[in-house]
Amino acid sequence: QSGNSNNFTVAGGTLTNTEDCPSNVFCTLNPLNAVYISFLQGNNTISGGNNGTDYSYIGSTIGASSGKYYWEVKAADLAEIDQVGVALASSGFSNIGNSGGLQATTFGGKGFQFSNGNKVGDGSQSAYMGGFSEDDIGMIALDLDNNKITFGRNGQWSNGSGGADQTYANST
């Protein structure tokens, strides 16, 4: 009931009280604060990503502080989209020129680089799974309950040589 007496009247039938409990909800890319980027296909596809000198950052529409998550990213344009992973929401996702990408300690980020397959984060990057080719699928499994993130390519988790069961600890 409205505190201002702005109430609806049921003309026929009955109302069903439902709790807001969404299931099967899918994350999309969040266009707020993104620069140099065009969003396509319901914010599931991007074009652009840099202006030659600056990184652009894109958050998602679902934030997380606990739980387990999995998503995939298709490498459609390796020249434009270079790093994929996670970063602390408190770092902000607007364009930050010459920031150093996810490997910059500013973002608390962890991820991988499409061009060479390096893992990035903690202020550095290192060889991990080899470079991606166009249409390869990057895989990210984030386990915030156990503080781990795992990366892979085309259905295979990486251990630094393309093998299995590699985790990248301290994801938060």
Regions picked out by a protein language model, each given a short descriptive name:
Residues 1-172:
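PRY/SPRY (B30.2) beta-sandwich protein-interaction domains
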